[in-house]
């Protein structure tokens, strides 16, 4: 189980990403459309002025059951341990143990 503070930090990051998503996208569109280097520099400074945690790359996928950051399957949002446990218990519809 991950520390509660780490899980809370990730929740805070997700809120910041959601809050600044439109502003960040509009600034990035302006930046890509600008031809003048000075104009690009000015827009880049505005982007840098946004909170660091509002960048989507800083959000880490975590298991929703345990909060673990590693070995998380995107399709389920579960870490490998929880995926195995829940699949064996039949809690994941459509997931069956393979045999050949």
Swiss-Prot record:
Annotated keywords: Ribonucleoprotein, Ribosomal protein, RNA-binding, rRNA-binding
The source's domain of life comes to Bacteria
- Which stretches are transmembrane? none
Q: Indicate yes or no for the key word Transmembrane.
A: no
In its UniProt record, a GO molecular function of this protein is: rRNA binding
A cellular component term (GO) from this record? small ribosomal subunit
- Keyword Iron-sulfur present in the record's keywords: the answer is no
Q: Which family does it belong to?
A: Belongs to the universal ribosomal protein uS14 family.
Stated role: Binds 16S rRNA, required for the assembly of 30S particles and may also be responsible for determining the conformation of the 16S rRNA at the A site.
Q: What is this protein called?
A: Small ribosomal subunit protein uS14
